[in-house]
Amino acid sequence: MKKLIQTIFCISSLFIYKPVIAEPQGLLETIHKHKFLTSTIPDNGDVNPYAVIVSQVTKGQLKQGDILIDNFNNISNLQGTGTTIVLYRPSTKETKLFAKIPQDLKDCPGGVGLTTAMTILKSGWLIVGSFPSKDGTTKTKGDGCLLVLDANGQHVTTWSGPLINGPWGNIASIDQGDSETLFISMAGFDVPSPEVIDPVTKFPIIKHEAKILRLEISETDDQVPMIKSQTIIADGFSQRADLANFLLGPTGLAIGDDETLYVTDGLDNEITAIPHAKTRTKSEGKGELITKDGLLAWPLAMVITDKGHLIVCNGKNGQVVEIDPINKKQIYAHWLNANQAQSPPGNGNLFGIAMASDKKGFYYVEDDINSLRIATP
């Protein structure tokens, strides 16, 4: 009987003391692998990968799941002079040039320097931003434009005008069947040369003229997309010329299921929210503060997960940060690039980011070695 009681006690103890494994609060806690996929340098020597997007369509040169990366610098490493888009196909591990746009394109004010503003419409048309420079600084910047390419990488038309000035950050979008709504940060308004110094900070002066532009686009498979309307839905974001980074301004844009637009402001080290982004008729200013400082260190490009969390690349270190925007909570920081050659480690190495097709991981670029990588569980 005594042995039976002891046996029962031991068995019950196993159940009592069995460890409970907590469910991950978000995506980053599940990420454990970082894999190199390809170099992002094409034959012409362009460097400094910026935008990363995943094709959701199969058309022309594009297959669903293809990754496209653009370059901001030319072979001389001058910022605002990159003209190429590279395609990587995960299914075959093939890397090839998708598009090369003439640097002195006449209908783009100032020429071509491809930025983080890039997206593929469901009809296969690609939109990419240009914020050009002649000498690699804002001293010789042009207003730039939005370039429309077909699914074979050919330039077909250019969008420019008074509301398009320095298209800079991620393009967030809402699909509506025969039309699409795009949200793009415009960071070029009133930005001076980096030689214009604030006497107090001893850094280039900070302006607060960056804006978020909403574009309503008509699209079909066969007709070149056209702009139906343009509306400034947010303004007052900080921007500053910078010799090392060309420009500091609002870079990350992501749209939630409730049509709230989230925006990163690197100079103010914060993320804000613009409610009713699809339907609002006037500017919300900088919007509602979601989170500031903490794990953020110059937040740049940003994506949104299936759970509605934001994944943000830090510019001042090699970390990404996960944020619950509804509860305004910073959840987790994860190292993607801990290169000790920079201080802090990974400083300036991260920029573009895109969710993988299975939503379990994400693609990102490393500027220090001009590469595309994937982060997975």
Protein language model regions, located:
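Short loop/turn segments immediately following beta-strands, especially the blade-tip
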Residues: 88-92, 215-225, 274-282, 323-330, ...
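Beta-rich, blade/repeat-based domains predominating
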Residues: 41-65, 80-82, 102-126, 131-133, ...
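Loop/turn-rich, solvent-exposed surfaces of beta-rich toroidal or solenoidal domains
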Residues: 266-270, 291-337
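Surface-exposed loop and turn segments in beta-propeller and other repeat-based domains
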Residues: 24-45, 91-112, 148-167, 218, ...
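Beta-propeller blade signature
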Residues: 82-91, 141-153, 206-218
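A detector of repeated loop/turn-to-beta-strand junctions in beta-rich toroidal repeat architectures
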Residues: 81-82, 141-145, 196-202, 206-209, ...
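Structural signal for beta-propeller blades
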Residues: 77, 85, 135, 146, ...
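Short loop/turn segments immediately following the C-termini of beta-strands
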Residues: 72-74, 130-133, 141, 185-189, ...
